[in-house]
Amino acid sequence: MTFRARHLLGIEHLAPDEIRSVLDLADSYVDLNRRTMKQSDALAGMTQINMFFENSTRTQSSFELAGKRLGADVMNMAVAQSSVKKGETLLDTAMTLNAMHPDLLVVRHPASGAVNLLASKVNCAVLNAGDGRHEHPTQALLDALTIRRAKGRIQRLTVAICGDIAHSRVARSNLILLGKMENRVRLIAPPTLMPPGVGEFGCELYDDMKKGLEGADVVMMLRLQKERMDGAFIPSEREYYHRFGLDAEKLAFAKEDAIVMHPGPMNRGVEIDGTLADDINRSVIQDQVEMGVAVRMACMDLLARNLRAERGRAAVGVMA
């Protein structure tokens, strides 16, 4: 099993064989999580601190559950009551936590690159749970696992990513991962929600849902991130749904066995029809939630293995 990373900061730093290693190990954790006894000792004796500078009940709960099932001591840092709110810088917080000798830091931050900066200042492994518009690596990995289990492979597929591309770190991480795994990627969005320069990733760009969905194996819908918008990016939610919301009529242009994905939380009736989101024959949205726990377990397990090996080499060096 190949995984060389010291931290997991983005998909851009992972090679295809490392991505496959994460997915293969995550597959075994899916099986574990379906048992009555869902416990592993992969992180026994290790401390995991979750630092979420943005609210995210779903992702934080997934990381917390993943750590506990691996046997870690898990602490959720209450950022709203922390010294950060009193004026302490992110680096000061990082140095303070580093002095407590944690083993894993799971960090979500509204500023792109903030997690990379923090990782450069601590001695433990750092896992990016989403930073600004930059990356959300575990979301892309769990999406890849969901696709692989549904389609039997994660190569040579046509994947349509639809919605608010401009503000989405999920879109960026998926675009990088799917490209590394030799898939054909289409981005579908109104011009106001299509970021400049995105075509450099080798994807196809569309502003027409029906044309973009034609022959797609996978349809991945994205939430309108109104909290990141500082202007009028769409005429109205009603008009947006009419042109870019996924319903049965538009999905008919994709392949007959195309799967429907959404990273959540969903705005039903805005980016996706509620009935379609709940269709067990097409939607794998709940599968994505399940795969999320398994993928995060795999990522933390692999990072912990590398951390233990690094500390072992350091101890041998001191003894020598």
UniProtKB/Swiss-Prot annotation:
Its catalytic activity?
A: carbamoyl phosphate + L-aspartate = N-carbamoyl-L-aspartate + phosphate + H(+)
Q: Which GO terms describe its cellular component?
A: cytosol
Cite the HAMAP family for this sequence: Asp_carb_tr
Function comment: Catalyzes the condensation of carbamoyl phosphate and aspartate to form carbamoyl aspartate and inorganic phosphate, the committed step in the de novo pyrimidine nucleotide biosynthesis pathway.
Family stated for the protein in its record: Belongs to the aspartate/ornithine carbamoyltransferase superfamily. ATCase family.
**UniProt record, GO biological process:** 'de novo' pyrimidine nucleobase biosynthetic process; 'de novo' UMP biosynthetic process; amino acid metabolic process
Keywords on record: Pyrimidine biosynthesis, Transferase
Q: In which pathway does it act?
A: Pyrimidine metabolism; UMP biosynthesis via de novo pathway; (S)-dihydroorotate from bicarbonate: step 2/3
Chain sites annotated for binding L-aspartate: 86, 169, 223
Task: Return the EC number.
Answer: 2.1.3.2
This protein is called what? Aspartate carbamoyltransferase catalytic subunit
Look up the domain of life of the source: Bacteria
- Pfam families found in the cross-reference section: OTCace, OTCace_N
Q: Which Gene3D superfamilies match?
A: Aspartate/ornithine carbamoyltransferase
Residues binding carbamoyl phosphate are 58-59, 108, 136, 139, 264-265
Record text on subunit structure and interactions: Heterododecamer (2C3:3R2) of six catalytic PyrB chains organized as two trimers (C3), and six regulatory PyrI chains organized as three dimers (R2).
Q: Does the keyword tRNA-binding apply?
A: no
Write one Gene Ontology MF term: amino acid binding
Span-the-membrane segments of this chain are none
UniProt keyword Transcription regulation, yes or no: no
Q: Which InterPro entries match?
A: Asp/Orn_carbamoyltranf_P-bd (IPR006132), Asp/Orn_carbamoylTrfase (IPR006130), Asp/Orn_carbamoylTrfase_sf (IPR036901), Asp_carbamoyltransf (IPR002082), Asp_carbamoyltransf_Asp/Orn-bd (IPR006131)
